Amino acid sequence: MLTCILDSQSAEFRFDNGDDGFVRSVVNRSAFWLSDSPAMNPTTSNRVILQPGFSSSLTRLWGEYWTYPNLDIGIKVTRNLAVTGKLFGFSTGKESPQILGAGLQYYFGGTDTLDWSTSIQRVDLKGLNHFRLTSLTLDIRKWISWKFIHFRLGMGSNFFKEVSYSGNHNAPAAMEGQINFIGVDALMRYTIVNIGAGTRINPGWTMVTFFIQKELF
C-alpha cells in the first residue's frame, strides 16, 4: 500500500517550462502540500500513529491534477503534547524529492476534554535539480465528534522560503511567501484502521487529502 502511494504521484518539481506562472505554481503547490499535518485525535488513548496517504489539487494545473504522496508519524509524549514527523522520499521522472520534517501538536480544552489542538511544523523539501524549499506551518483546530465520525476543523498559515539552482530556466533566485488556509478533516473507524479525508482551502486554490491511519499502540 505504501509503495503504491509513493509511486502514484504526478506532481511537477521542475522549472523546464520556463513560464513565470508555471514556476510559481510549482513552488506554491509544493509549499501548500507540505502544510498538511497528521490528524492525531487528542481524545483517544493511542500514543503512536502512522498515516500514509496522498494530496491532490482540486483543479487542473497545466492539464493535470498534481498529486503528492504523504507519510506522517505521530507520537504522544504526554496527554497534551505530541511530536510529529515526515521522513520519506520517492522518484518522479527525473526528480527524487526528499521530505524531512518535524513538528509539535499541543492539545487543550475543558477540564476533562482536550478538543482543541494547535500545531507548529517545519518541513524541508530537498533532492531536486531546480530548487529547495523550507516551509513552516502554524494552525489551530477544533475536534468535533458526530456519531462515528471525528472532524478536525480550523485554519492555519504556511510560510515558505525557496532557493532556485542555476539551470536552463528563468526562475527567480529565491522566492518566499505566505499561504493562509481553512482546513477540514474527517476520520472514521474501519476494522483496525482509521480512514480519513480532508481539504485545505485557499482563495487561490484547493487541495484534497485522503489517508489511512494506523494506531500502533
Predicted ranges, named:
Residues 112, 204-206:
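Short loop/turn segments at connectors of secondary-structure elements within structured domains
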Residues 1-10:
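Gram-negative bacterial Sec-dependent N-terminal signal peptides
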Residues 82-92, 116, 182-190, 210-217:
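Repeat-unit-sized solenoid/scaffold elements
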Residues 70-72, 101-103, 137-139, 181-185, ...:
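Membrane-embedded beta-strand positions in outer-membrane beta-barrel channels/transporters
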Residues 95-96, 163-164, 206-210:
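A short, polar/proline- and glycine-enriched secondary-structure boundary/capping micro-motif
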Residues 56-116, 121-122:
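Glycine- and aromatic-enriched membrane insertion/assembly motifs of diderm outer-membrane
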Residues 9-49, 53, 61-64, 128-194, ...:
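Outer-membrane beta-barrel transmembrane domain signature
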Residues 1, 41-45, 73-76, 110-113, ...:
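Short hydrophobic/aromatic-rich motifs at helix boundaries and adjacent loops
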